[in-house]
Regions:
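Cofactor-binding active-site loop characterized by glycine-rich and histidine/acidic residues
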Residues: 3, 7-15, 19, 23-31, ...
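Gly-rich Lys/Arg/Thr-decorated short loops/hinges at beta-loop-alpha junctions or inter-strand turns
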Residues: 1-3, 105-114, 148-152, 183-190, ...
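Short glycine-/polar-rich loops that comprise or flank the Walker A/P-loop
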Residues: 150, 177-181, 212
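Short internal beta-strands
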Residues: 66-70, 180-188
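Long, well-ordered, tryptophan-enriched scaffold segments
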Residues: 187-305
Length: 305
């Protein structure tokens, strides 16, 4: 019998396909005039959020919780609600068109159950913190004291952390003993406006800790952690953590044979690490190297629990 994790993986793949198709259809399949401009839609930003949103929505959330979905993950959000019967095929087909599903989740223009309107980029992040503060105010009132406290969750693109209002909000949260607030940062190191510099996550973590947040970093998935426990695993872990993002992305695209060649070239034949690699086919090696924390449903579910 399939496990809950198996069902989550099925949902993950369907969300990945449908969100990618929604953007592809808007740009390449539906009728357009010769002078129409490109529609856009951020397929990569969607792909990096699929596992996170699958674990969050289908494993973790309670009815009283509220979520601000990062703007560029709107196609994933619309795809998810389509699977649940809350969105129509016609609106997906007209994504980013007049009357279609919106570019960014919108409480006033979308028909799926949007908790927070999250355009412009960066605003949805701060909304969750102030919503939590308002929730604390209401809890102090006798007419709202029995309401269950919800978690205010922001799904944050790493490039959204360029927005100054995020840091103003962190300070306000510290002043008012912010609680029941999750900010889940999609650290995909991709930005249309610039480069997300290597090592930025450490600076971000320091800032959150300075304002009293409990930080959890999901760097490696379950497959990688299991491999690290094998002889030669620490060598592999060290290589992964020092590999530049540009190289890692290129190797992910090329696949298992490229991973094997690069690892052997960089590390050399060292017995244990060579045996670790030899125990895995090219496909298995690719799955291992792609099993980072943000793409591992098991790791995400465990962290959210």
């Amino acid at each position: 019998m399939p496990s809950q994790l198996d069902h989550l993986k099925t949902l993950e793949q369907r969300l990945l396909w449908l969100s990618a198709w929604t953007v592809h259809n808007a740009n390449h399949l539906r009728d357009k005039r010769d002078d129409d401009v490109k529609v856009g839609g951020h397929q990569a930003s969607c792909a990096s959020m699929v596992s996170i949103m699958t674990a969050l929505y289908f494993h973790t959330l309670r009815p009283e919780d509220r979520v601000a979905v990062k703007p560029h993950a709107a196609p994933v959000y619309h795809a998810m609600h389509y699977l649940m019967g809350n969105q129509t095929l016609e609106k997906l087909q007209n994504f980013r068109g007049y009357g279609g599903a919106q570019s960014y989740p919108s409480r006033t223009k979308d028909i799926d159950d949007v908790d927070f309107s999250t355009g412009s980029v960066g605003l949805g992040v701060a909304e969750t913190a102030f919503a939590s503060i308002v929730q604390d105010y209401l809890e102090a009132k006798p007419w709202a004291a029995d309401r269950p406290l919800g978690r205010m969750v922001a799904l944050v693109g790493d490039a959204e952390l360029d927005e100054g209002n995020v840091y103003e909000c962190l300070q306000e949260g510290w002043k008012h003993d912010l609680r029941n607030t999750w900010w889940i940062i999609d650290y995909n190191r991709q930005s249309l406006d610039g480069v997300v510099h290597e090592g930025l996550w450490e600076k971000v973590e320091d800032i959150f800790k300075a304002f009293g947040w409990r930080t959890v970093v999901l760097r490696h998935g379950a497959l990688q952690r299991e491999a690290f426990a094998e002889p030669g695993g620490e060598t592999l872990k060290s290589w992964i953590q020092s590999c530049p993002n540009a190289d890692y992305s290129a190797l992910t695209y090329k696949g298992g044979a490229a991973w094997r060649a690069r690892l052997m070239n960089d590390i050399g034949d060292q017995g244990d690490i060579t045996a670790l690699l030899d125990r895995r086919s090219d496909d298995e090696l690719a799955a291992l190297m792609n099993n980072l924390g943000g793409q591992c449903l098991q790791s995400l579910c465990d962290a959210f629990d």
